[in-house]
C-alpha cells in the first residue's frame, strides 16, 4: 500500500511538472510571436503620461449636446473575459416586422485628439492584438479598460448609429448617426 501511494505521488508530481512545462512552452511561443511581429509590449513614457491626463470619469458638462441613451438596455458584444468593451448594441421591436437597431461605440476621439501623442501611438499600433494569454492594447489600459470602455453602470461618451430595419424588405429604411452618452 505504501509503494502504491509513492507511485501515485510521483505520477502527480510529474503531471504538475508537465503542466508547468506546457505553460512555459506556450509562454515562449507567444513571446516568439510578439518578437517576430515586432509588437510593442509597453507604451513609451510620454504616452503613459498623456493617458494620465485623461479624466477617469465624465463631467456633467460633457453630456451637453449629446443624446442621452442611458435608460436603454444597451449590451456590449465583447467576450466574457474582455475588459476593453468598446462596442454595444440595442434592439427594439417597433412593429411586427420592424426593428430599431442601435450600434454604439466608445467615443475615443473625444479623449484622443488628432496628431496628439496618444493618437500617434494608436496609429502606429493600428489595433489591439489579442493573444491567448494577453492583450496588447492600442491605447494604454487607463483608457482602453477605463474611460473608453463601455463598462456596465458607468456613464460613457459614445458614437451611435441607429438603423430602422424592415424584416420583410430585408433592408433598412433610415440611418441616423449622432453623439450620445450610454
Give the role of each language-model region:
Residues 158-159, 163:
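Phosphate/diphosphate-binding loops
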Residues 174-182:
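Single conserved hydrophobic/aromatic residue that forms the stacking wall/gate
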Residues 93-95, 165-170:
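Short acidic-glycine loop/turn motifs at beta-strand connectors
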Residues 8, 171-172:
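Low-complexity basic/metal-binding stretches
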Residues 1-102, 109-154:
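Charge-lined substrate channels and their catalytic hotspots, especially those that engage the 3′ end
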Amino acid at each position: 500500500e505504501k509503494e502504491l501511494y509513492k507511485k501515485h505521488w510521483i505520477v502527480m508530481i510529474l503531471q504538475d511538472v508537465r503542466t508547468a512545462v506546457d505553460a512555459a512552452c506556450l509562454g515562449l511561443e507567444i513571446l516568439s510571436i510578439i518578437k517576430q511581429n515586432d509588437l510593442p509590449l509597453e507604451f513609451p513614457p510620454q504616452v503613459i503620461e498623456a493617458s494620465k491626463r485623461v479624466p477617469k470619469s465624465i463631467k456633467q458638462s460633457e453630456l451637453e449636446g449629446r443624446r442621452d441613451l442611458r435608460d436603454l438596455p444597451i449590451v456590449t458584444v465583447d467576450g466574457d473575459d474582455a475588459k476593453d468593451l468598446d462596442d454595444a448594441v440595442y434592439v427594439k421591436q417597433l412593429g411586427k416586422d420592424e426593428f430599431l437597431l442601435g450600434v454604439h461605440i466608445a467615443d475615443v476621439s473625444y479623449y484622443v485628439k488628432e496628431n496628439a501623442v496618444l493618437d500617434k501611438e494608436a496609429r502606429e499600433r493600428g489595433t489591439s492584438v489579442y493573444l491567448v494569454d494577453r492583450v496588447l492594447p492600442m491605447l494604454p489600459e487607463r483608457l482602453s479598460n477605463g474611460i473608453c470602455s463601455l463598462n456596465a453602470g458607468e456613464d460613457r461618451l459614445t458614437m451611435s448609429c441607429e438603423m430602422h430595419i424592415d424584416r420583410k424588405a430585408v433592408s433598412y429604411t433610415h440611418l441616423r448617426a449622432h453623439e450620445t452618452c450610454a
